[in-house]
Amino acid sequence: MEAFVRETGRAVVIPNDNINTDIILPKQFLKNILKTGFGKDLFFDWRYNADGSLNEAFELNKPAHQGASILITGNDFGSGSSREHAVWALTDYGFRAVIGGGFSDIFYMNSTKNGLLPIVLPEENRKILRGIQADENIQIDLPEQTVTYKNYTFHFDINSQWKEKFINGEDDIDNTMKYEKLIAAFEKQRPNFG
C-alpha cells in the first residue's frame, strides 16, 4: 500500500447522498480480481451516455477535473453490497481520499485496507469545500488529522491503528509480517499433526 502522509491536490465534488457501490462500480465490472483497470468504469452509468459516449456534463469528465486526487461527496457514501472493487475503481482512477458526511461500515473498512483515506466531515465543513474551484487545491495532513482549504482548517478523526498503517504504507499482510519471528517461534512449539 502506498504511504499517505500528506496529500495536496485538486478535488472533484459529487455532492449526492446515498451513492452506493453499484453506482460507484456497476456489477458487470466485477469479473476481475486484479486491483487495476477499474478507473475507466468508475461511476459508469453517470459518466457515459446510453450510446457509450462521454456524458460531458458529469464532473469527472470535465477537463478541469482530470488528475484530481480528492473526492468530496455527500452522506452515506459506499452503501450497499460489500464491493471491494468499488474502492479499487476509486484508487485506480487516482483518488487518494474521499471526504464525505459518512460511509457505510463495510466501505469504510474496504477503503482503509486498500489505501483510500475516508474522511468524515460535518455538513458545514463540506459546504465550504464544495465551493472549491477546479484550479484550487485542498491539503490533507494525516499526522495532524486536518483538511485545509484556503484559510479554513477542519479536523477529522481516524482510528490510531489505521492512521499508522496509512502513514507507514502498510496493509494487513505487512502488519502481520511484523510478527513473523514470533509466529515462527510459536509454530515451533506446537506439535505437528501432519
UniProtKB/Swiss-Prot annotation:
Its EC number is 4.2.1.33. Keywords: Amino-acid biosynthesis, Branched-chain amino acid biosynthesis, Leucine biosynthesis, Lyase. CDD domains: IPMI_Swivel. One of its GO terms (biological process) is L-leucine biosynthetic process. It comes from the Bacteria. Pathway: Amino-acid biosynthesis; L-leucine biosynthesis; L-leucine from 3-methyl-2-oxobutanoate: step 2/4. Pfam families: Aconitase_C (PF00694). One of its GO terms (molecular function) is 3-isopropylmalate dehydratase activity. GO terms for cellular component: 3-isopropylmalate dehydratase complex. It is an enzyme of class 4 (lyase). It catalyses: (2R,3S)-3-isopropylmalate = (2S)-2-isopropylmalate. Heterodimer of LeuC and LeuD. NCBIfam families: leuD, PRK01641.1. Belongs to the LeuD family. LeuD type 1 subfamily. Catalyzes the isomerization between 2-isopropylmalate and 3-isopropylmalate, via the formation of 2-isopropylmaleate. This is 3-isopropylmalate dehydratase small subunit. It comes from Leuconostoc mesenteroides subsp. mesenteroides (strain ATCC 8293 / DSM 20343 / BCRC 11652 / CCM 1803 / JCM 6124 / NCDO 523 / NBRC 100496 / NCIMB 8023 / NCTC 12954 / NRRL B-1118 / 37Y). The gene is leuD.
